[in-house]
């Protein structure tokens, strides 16, 4: 069992990106500013700095090698999930399972939402197989953690056996 956790800023291209951070919040820091009071334009606890970013494809190649196959990839990037996936598009066929947190509302300025990510993954060979978690705020569903499986993975056959 070989597992690596890699904490880095990923995007669909290399370069510098503005990164919004709140010194008093333990969540929500992102390249896409949150549409919340914690990251409002008048909040003096929020700082913006330029950080270096890389693509998922380059990160995997540099850390795991050119021929890496990924059994399980989790992405929770505060609205940047689609950008990260686009930056790893050539890797997608080698990934078996994806777990993504996806917003259903405009939670991060210019952040991707569930429908766009779902459409991209379906077009690139993945099936949604399970909603792992629902996140609500004041009774409104705002995000989901969703499990996607590569349509060419043997797991799809097992799932189909259970369903049909």
Which role fits each region the language model picked out?
Residues 1-164:
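Phosphate/nucleotide-binding beta-alpha loop and adjacent structural elements of enzyme active sites
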């Amino acid at each position: 069992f070989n597992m690596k956790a890699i904490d880095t800023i990923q995007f669909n291209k290399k370069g510098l990106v503005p990164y919004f951070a709140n010194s008093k919040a333990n969540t929500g820091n992102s390249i896409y500013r949150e549409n919340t009071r914690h990251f409002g334009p008048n909040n003096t606890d929020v700082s913006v700095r330029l950080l270096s970013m890389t693509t998922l494809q380059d990160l995997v190649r540099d850390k795991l090698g050119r021929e890496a196959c990924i059994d399980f990839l989790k992405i929770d990037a505060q609205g940047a999930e689609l950008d990260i996936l686009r930056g790893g598009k050539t890797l997608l066929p080698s990934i078996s399972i994806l777990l993504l947190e996806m917003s259903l509302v405009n939670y991060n300025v210019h952040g991707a939402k569930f429908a766009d990510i779902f459409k991209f993954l379906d077009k690139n060979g993945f099936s949604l197989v399970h909603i792992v978690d629902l996140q609500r705020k004041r009774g409104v569903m705002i995000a989901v953690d969703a499990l996607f499986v590569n349509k060419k993975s043997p797991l799809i056959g097992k799932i189909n056996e259970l369903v049909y």
